[in-house]
Amino acid sequence: MRRSIVIVIALTAKGFLHRHLLEKGNLVTALSLRICNSRAFSGRSDYRERLRSGLHSIKFNDALTLFCDMAESHPLPSIVDFSRLLIAIAKLNKYEAVISLFRHLEMLGISHDLYSFTTLIDCFCRCARLSLALSCLGKMMKLGFEPSIVTFGSLVNGFCHVNRFYEAMSLVDQIVGLGYEPNVVIYNTIIDSLCEKGQVNTALDVLKHMKKMGIRPDVVTYNSLITRLFHSGTWGVSARILSDMMRMGISPDVITFSALIDVYGKEGQLLEAKKQYNEMIQRSVNPNIVTYNSLINGLCIHGLLDEAKKVLNVLVSKGFFPNAVTYNTLINGYCKAKRVDDGMKILCVMSRDGVDGDTFTYNTLYQGYCQAGKFSAAEKVLGRMVSCGVHPDMYTFNILLDGLCDHGKIGKALVRLEDLQKSKTVVGIITYNIIIKGLCKADKVEDAWYLFCSLALKGVSPDVITYITMMIGLRRKRLWREAHELYRKMQKEDGLMPIK
């Protein structure tokens, strides 16, 4: 009876999987074959010893070399040994490589077992190749293998990965009809994927269905729902879900508490955030770096920078290492509070602790100095950014242009814009909006109008901000008719609606 699920698949996709594996040989397969062919038989290491010592920390290139050693061995290793290696490669997120290496195994005449089929199906699903995953399922069942709930779990995950949630639920119903019992992991996969896509109401329906089927939700189930509901502002529903969780005797974990602290902090309910922190300590739930980062972020958002610094000291005293998120949050907080020099001190601490700054780090400091009109200090930040191997992006240049325009240095801003254009950098509408606004602010409305009219020649379409900025400039010059005509053009020709 269970085989009925793949009769259609097996008939319609007959040979599809085999053709794919023959036709889609890629660089990884070529590389592995080249290594195999170039190595002398006597130089091989004993693959058995490597397998015995464990594969949890193996690197990709070493895994390929080990695969070649195994493929050259006489007699050939079993599919069980190959599966152990290929599962380790899959854990490195090298799914395409695993698919290619399975093709090589088939060429060597090594037959699949249940676990190798399940691994291959999982890799197809993670590469969003569901038709091949289903073909593989059909092939394995045709050969007499009974898929496990893990196999079906991979397929459900594959459907969710490409947002085919209805088919994921339909597959779960078919699994039940075939006598399998879906576990909480399968339902968690669907609920979490729905929450990630903002389809929380559907996720709540799945939760109801899950309970109806007698599957007990766990803390992972509730964490997905609570996190999404809180972040979407549906406090009433999220509180109800949290109560439901507690009523079922499911204890909140570090993820639950961190999510609550994060939301309360962002909403300015700092006392409640601290209350949640104290409660997790009382419940012997150990905070992690995400918990502390959430606390620091909430304090920084609301300008309590000294308290945020104290939390940083606490996490260090408890043996945690601040990461880029920790430091970036503090730097951003200081810059928002116009304490950019203090932000620079955090960057120095960050560098001392061996944590590399990223584009966000440097752009935040760069923007802080530009907004304060300290362009000399801003240039030093830019120099440090480049010397550390972090490349400025378009946002970096926009920060400079915006700062120059805000401080009445429109001439320098225009020179920088010209330099950008000469460097063949693609300049977008955001950059032109900054310059148009700067020209209007400097009472150079005619120049702004000329730039506005030349946008089409530059291959750039104006957006609502462009129109509104230009209309404000025209109205300041009391050019009412021109402003009104521009408003009509915005609505009729470009189909843009004004911002309320």
Curated annotation (Swiss-Prot):
Highest taxon above the source species: Eukaryota
* Coiled-coil positions: none
Q: What PROSITE patterns does this protein's entry cite? A: PPR (PS51375)
Q: What is this protein called?
A: Pentatricopeptide repeat-containing protein At1g06580
Task: Please tell me whether the keyword Repeat is annotated for this protein.
Answer: yes
Q: Which GO terms describe its biological process?
A: defense response to bacterium
The cross-references to InterPro entries, in alphabetical order and at most eight, read:
Pentatricopeptide_rpt (IPR002885), TPR-like_helical_dom_sf (IPR011990)
The entry assigns this protein to a family as follows: Belongs to the PPR family. P subfamily.
The PPR repeats are at 78-112, 113-147, 148-182, 183-217, 218-252, 253-287, 288-322, 323-357, 358-392, 393-427, 428-462, 463-498
In terms of NCBIfam families, this protein maps to:
PPR
Q: Which UniProt keywords apply?
A: Repeat
Q: What PANTHER family does the annotation carry?
A: PENTATRICOPEPTIDE REPEAT-CONTAINING PROTEIN GUN1, CHLOROPLASTIC, PPR_LONG DOMAIN-CONTAINING PROTEIN
